[in-house]
C-alpha cells in the first residue's frame, strides 16, 4: 500500500487509521494516532462538516495532522469507496449512537469480508447492545458522567457537578486508542481482526472506581468534597494561602509528623487516634480530622504560596500552586519541556497550544500539518485507493463526495 504524502515519524509510522465521528470523543482517539505518526483519515459528512469546525480555535489542535475525506459512506458508490478504503486500513474507529453502522448495513462481518485483519473500534454512549431504553440514545460528556456514577461524586457537598472540560470524551477517546493498539498487537499475532465495543458510561464507571468500591463492598458512599478538599483525607486537596491557592497531599509518616509540629499539633502524635506510623489522616473517622483542617487552614492563610512551597519542599510534602492559564506559558517547567508550542494553520496563521504528549525519546511525534479544510484530501485519498479523476468527479456529481473548492 502506498501512503498519502506526509513525513515519516513517530512509533506508529506506516499505520493507516480511519475514523468517523464528530466533536471530541472519537476524534480524540484519531488525534492521538496522528500525533504519534500514523496516517489518519478523518471522514466527514458531504453536506455538513463536523460541528467542531464552528469553534474558533480548538479544532486547530484536535484536527491537526489529519487527512480530510468528505464521503457519504452509507450510500451506493460512496459505500463502495468506503469499503475499498477499509481494504488498506489497519484501524477503523467510529463514534455514533449504539450499533448505528450495523443498522445501516455496515456490520463487522461486512468490514472483515473486505479486510479480515481490520481492527474496528465502536465508541458510543451506552454500547453496541443492552436494553432498547438506552442502547440507541445519544450521549455526550455530561450524559456519560451522569449515567456512570462519576458526576454524582464530583462537585460540592451542596450539589453534584460534572467534571470539565469534557472529561468523559477524553477518557473515552484515549480508551479507544489504547484498546485499538492492544487489538492490533493481537491481530498481528493471529491474523484475525477484532471488534471493540467502547461504552462511554463504562469508561467513566471504571474511572470513578476509587470511592465506589467502598459502596459495592460494604455500602459506604463517600461524601462529596467541601471547597475542593479531599472527601476522605485531611490535608489533601485545595487550600488558600495568603496570596492564592495551592493543592497539597499530606501523605507519609515523616510528612505528617513535621507538618503537625509546624501547625501546633505535635501533641497529637502517638495518641490512640493518631498512632505512630500514621500515613494518612481520615477526616471523618479520625476525631481530630476537623481540627487538623482548622489548624492547617489557619497556618496556610498566614503564609504566601512561595513560603509554603519552600517549607513543604523541605518536608517532602507534595504541593503545587494552582496556576492560571496565563501563567502556564512563562512557567519554567513548561518552557524547559516546550509543553506549549506553535504550528502553522492551513491558511498560514500561527496557532498556539499543547505540544505532543507523551514524549517518545527515540521516535518522537511531531506536528506536520494544521487542520485540513472540509474535503481537502478527498481526491488524494480516492486516488490512493485506485479511483481515477473521472471516478472521483462522478462521486462528486452524485453528491456522494466533496472535494476541496
Swiss-Prot record:
Keyword Cytoplasm among record annotations: yes
Organism superkingdom: Bacteria
GO cellular component: cytoplasm
Top-level EC class as recorded in UniProt: transferase
Database matches in SUPFAM superfamilies: CoA-transferase family III (CaiB/BaiF)
Coiled-coil annotated residue ranges, if any: none
Keyword annotations from UniProtKB, A to Z: Cytoplasm, Transferase
Any one Pfam family match given in the protein's UniProt record, by short name: CoA_transf_3
Intracellular or extracellular location(s): Cytoplasm
Cytoplasm is among the record's keywords: yes
Principal location class: cytoplasm
Entry binding sites for CoA: 97, 104
Active site: 169 (nucleophile)
InterPro entries: CoA-transferase_III, CoA-Trfase_CaiB, CoA-Trfase_fam_III, CoA-Trfase_III_dom3_sf, CoA-Trfase_III_dom_1_sf
Pathway: Amine and polyamine metabolism; carnitine metabolism
Reactions accelerated catalytically: crotonobetainyl-CoA + (R)-carnitine = crotonobetaine + (R)-carnitinyl-CoA; 4-(trimethylamino)butanoyl-CoA + (R)-carnitine = (R)-carnitinyl-CoA + 4-(trimethylamino)butanoate
GO MF annotations in UniProt: L-carnitine CoA-transferase activity
Induction: By L-carnitine or crotonobetaine.
Gene Ontology biological process: carnitine catabolic process
HAMAP family cross-referenced by the UniProt entry: CaiB
Family per record: Belongs to the CoA-transferase III family. CaiB subfamily.
Function (record text): Catalyzes the reversible transfer of the CoA moiety from gamma-butyrobetainyl-CoA to L-carnitine to generate L-carnitinyl-CoA and gamma-butyrobetaine. Is also able to catalyze the reversible transfer of the CoA moiety from gamma-butyrobetainyl-CoA or L-carnitinyl-CoA to crotonobetaine to generate crotonobetainyl-CoA.
Subunit relationships: Homodimer.
PANTHER family (UniProt xref): L-CARNITINE COA-TRANSFERASE, SUCCINYL-COA--D-CITRAMALATE COA-TRANSFERASE
Remarks, miscellaneous: Some strains of E.coli, such as ATCC 25922, can metabolize carnitine under aerobiosis.
Name of this protein: L-carnitine CoA-transferase
Source species taxonomy: Bacteria, Pseudomonadati, Pseudomonadota, Gammaproteobacteria, Enterobacterales
Amino acid at each position: 500500500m502506498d501512503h498519502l504524502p506526509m513525513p515519516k515519524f513517530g512509533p506508529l509510522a506506516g499505520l493507516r487509521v480511519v475514523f468517523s465521528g464528530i466533536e471530541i470523543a472519537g476524534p480524540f482517539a484519531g488525534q492521538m494516532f496522528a500525533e504519534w505518526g500514523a496516517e489518519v483519515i478523518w471522514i466527514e459528512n458531504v453536506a455538513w462538516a463536523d460541528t467542531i469546525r464552528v469553534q474558533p480555535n480548538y479544532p486547530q489542535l484536535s484536527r491537526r495532522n489529519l487527512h480530510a475525506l468528505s464521503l457519504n459512506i452509507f450510500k451506493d458508490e460512496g459505500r463502495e469507496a468506503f469499503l475499498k478504503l477499509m481494504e488498506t486500513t489497519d484501524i477503523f474507529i467510529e463514534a455514533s449512537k449504539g450499533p448505528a453502522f450495523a443498522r445501516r448495513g455496515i456490520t463487522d462481518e461486512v468490514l472483515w469480508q473486505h479486510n479480515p485483519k481490520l481492527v474496528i473500534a465502536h465508541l458510543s454512549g451506552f454500547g453496541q447492545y443492552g436494553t432498547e431504553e438506552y442502547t440507541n440514545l445519544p450521549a455526550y460528556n455530561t450524559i456519560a458522567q451522569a449515567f456512570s456514577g462519576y458526576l454524582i461524586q464530583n462537585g460540592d457537598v451542596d450539589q453534584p457537578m460534572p467534571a470539565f472540560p469534557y472529561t468523559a470524551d477524553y477518557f473515552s477517546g484515549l480508551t479507544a486508542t489504547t484498546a485499538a493498539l492492544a487489538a492490533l498487537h493481537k491481530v498481528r499475532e493471529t491474523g484475525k481482526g477484532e471488534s471493540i465495543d467502547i461504552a462511554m458510561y463504562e469508561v467513566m464507571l471504571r474511572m470513578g472506581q476509587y470511592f465506589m468500591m467502598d459502596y459495592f463492598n460494604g455500602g459506604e458512599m463517600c461524601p462529596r468534597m467541601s471547597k475542593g478538599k479531599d472527601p476522605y483525607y485531611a490535608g489533601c486537596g485545595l487550600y488558600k494561602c495568603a496570596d492564592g491557592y495551592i493543592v497539597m497531599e499530606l501523605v507519609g509518616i515523616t510528612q505528617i509528623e513535621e507538618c503537625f509540629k509546624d501547625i501546633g499539633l505535635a501533641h497529637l502524635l502517638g495518641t490512640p487516634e493518631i498512632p505512630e506510623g500514621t500515613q494518612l489522616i481520615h477526616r471523618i473517622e479520625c476525631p481530630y480530622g476537623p481540627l487538623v483542617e482548622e489548624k492547617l487552614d489557619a497556618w496556610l492563610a498566614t503564609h504566601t504560596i512561595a513560603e509554603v512551597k519552600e517549607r513543604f519542599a523541605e518536608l517532602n510534602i507534595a504541593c503545587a500552586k494552582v496556576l492560571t492559564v496565563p501563567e502556564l506559558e512563562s512557567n519554567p517547567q513548561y518552557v524547559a519541556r516546550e509543553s506549549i508550542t506553535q504550528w502553522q494553520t492551513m491558511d498560514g496563521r500561527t496557532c498556539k497550544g499543547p505540544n505532543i504528549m507523551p514524549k517518545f525519546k527515540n521516535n518522537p511525534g511531531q506536528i506536520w500539518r494544521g487542520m485540513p479544510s472540509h474535503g481537502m484530501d478527498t481526491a488524494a485519498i480516492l486516488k490512493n485507493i485506485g479511483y481515477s479523476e473521472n471516478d472521483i468527479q462522478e462521486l462528486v456529481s452524485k453528491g456522494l463526495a466533496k472535494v476541496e473548492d
